[in-house]
């Protein structure tokens, strides 16, 4: 079916074109040609213009929609002015691509309703012609490189409701013509270079619900006119330069959920009436000059969300209701009168509590692996900084503390507490252990050293940008800025890690000389509202640091009267002797002799991972002792080991009889070395030496999900419902990364419960990429070698070798059912009688009782709504038609509750119904009737045991 059969209504994240004809549904040739030019300009050349039935819906002779997903498509062209050849165009959504150039002014003649261009490389001004688009309701240009003044003509938009211009380089004042935008509900200009004050005319925007003016360049004070915006739910103003001013009048704004007035030079007391706005979910008044006591009315906020009064001049006592709230309340940098032995000191971050701190001893150095485990780097021990994310105040055993203020807030007012991030870029570092994880903060991150010897020091702050990637896609477009304070003095304004280091994944070390006079050192990193907040995803911003090293800057004096020249001579002679000794030893052991072709091939890969010697691996595994053998991987046995620095590792050893062979081993190394995600097993390095082919992974403490759910009784873990849901979401995130976010588009091909490992905190990590296949160019191809596990394999792959990422989606659906059910997918009643969990799901669908699938071991201790959602998603994922399965990014959104499960698609999800499957379903009914009695008896015994145990206590 050709392109000329269809009409288009909008060109968007989904390109939608809707048109109504009385008797025909043919696209005029002129518009068809225009559409082809559009795709060429966007450099989107791989769209099949023959319409897939999954993408078009029609009624009789009237074609209603055609959709083409162009969001996150890594488009690298420019914006096509040829869209004017599609006169019925209503929507443009090219968000999160890599498009460059300017915005075509020609678009001003189109009847557009929505323009979404978030997250690209667009430059130049906003076309003044946009003021002619009277139909426009939404203009989203956030996270680009647009510049110039805001056009006066934008004030002529009578229907505009959403104008998001944050994270650009706009300058000048907000035009007075904007006073006419009385339909606005959402206005954002954060992270720009605007000038002037916040205009009084905003009082006319009486329908406004969201107003974001963070680090915009505008100066204070906050105008009195803001009191008229009674519909406000989300007000964020921060880093507002200008004179001191009293707290703005917000008494009549009673729907407020998020209020951020951070670093706005506010003075005076905290207003009593704020305590009467019970809709608050997030209240941040930090880094102002507010004084006085906390009003009694604020007790009404005790069951609310988050309160940050950091960095003011508040005094008096801390109310009892604010004690023991953990990271949800921060009162640091104030003047409260507190007994150092009071619980407030431990739970509310009141700095006065450190005045009477007793040092265990004095130190002449400080080394911290921020966000990571303890490790040794060139003989120097970097202390662990991996405390619980729910704590905002951490006390080490060696005289240093850290304070992490804030939670990340998205558009939905949903706060998220994240304090550690793992690497998702390609690291180009030597001491990679210091940079694979980092400490992050949403507002302010402070380290205090209280027990240093007095003297001169060099404070070295180690940074590497690990949350953006360096590829030519939207994930490389993020910009992180924060300020660096040393001893409460601003040393660096708007520090940008990637820019300083010349790229993401590179290391930059900032050194600051400091004289310590009272044994105390303070390092503070502060987010001043600058930078993107939605790239590569929402809530990515704020300070990030990998490590801290503080060393004395004074060289030790020569002893015993030895001159400096003599000392240097001895050092040179000793160094030469050591070099010859090491060279001879290595030659004797064969390390410097000619290497095999395999080793040469490995060296040519130039991978960004560690290369281990065979001797290191043998020592770590006790010469591959069978006692350290922990399993069988895709290549051969897997051993547990311990490196010299104490790091526990898992070593995958290629068996000599492996069918996959050396070539695929090297391919796996090349592939895995480019992948970094919290839900993928981390590759530390490899060894290609002496005929041995070894991969060195992080050791994952709790083995596989399969063993935890339905392995031998002694290996099973009691996984409660929140943990199961967390595991399911983690696996989905890992697959979404493989399919859509990594530089290489990868299909795993063997997703199953045994290939999902659980770490100490029961976070899931996808393992065994030995069967993975790169999905580089074609979205669909025929696999020359079927690889996977029956029962988890998608039907189109198992029967026809038809491989796409939707095969992994199918396998994920099976794993999700296992997580809910707590039993293996494959059930063998006899040698010739095998059936699968998906058959039982169909039985329960017929009975309209899907919740019967939930693991009976959970009893009633699970969230019914979440369980139903997970089952429904699994059903959609296991549809027999690949095009009916959702993408993994859609699965993540549905699991996290950010997107509703579409009932229509759920009903459309088809399942094979061959005679054999119907027989299996009948067998399933009988089987579950039988085990139902066993489970009932078992649960009764468990409940009885619990009752007896409770009675004993």
Swiss-Prot record:
Residues 1-22 form the signal peptide. CDD domains: STKc_IRAK (cd14066). PANTHER family: LEUCINE-RICH REPEAT-CONTAINING PROTEIN DDB_G0281931-RELATED, PROTEIN KINASE DOMAIN-CONTAINING PROTEIN. It is a single-pass type I membrane protein. It is found in: Membrane. Residues 23-566 are extracellular. Glycans are attached at residues 100, 132, 265, 315, 335, 378, 423. Its main location: membrane. GO terms for molecular function: ATP binding; protein serine kinase activity; protein serine/threonine kinase activity. Residues 624-901 form the Protein kinase domain. PROSITE patterns: PROTEIN_KINASE_DOM, PROTEIN_KINASE_ST. Keywords: ATP-binding, Glycoprotein, Kinase, Leucine-rich repeat, Membrane, Nucleotide-binding, Phosphoprotein, Receptor, Repeat, Serine/threonine-protein kinase, Signal, Transferase, Transmembrane, Transmembrane helix. It comes from the Eukaryota. The modification Phosphotyrosine is found at residues 697, 797. It comes from Arabidopsis thaliana (Mouse-ear cress). The active site is at 750 (proton acceptor). Belongs to the protein kinase superfamily. Ser/Thr protein kinase family. LRR repeats lie at residues 63-86, 88-110, 111-132, 135-158, 159-182, 183-205. This is Probable LRR receptor-like serine/threonine-protein kinase At1g53420. The keyword RNA-binding does not apply.
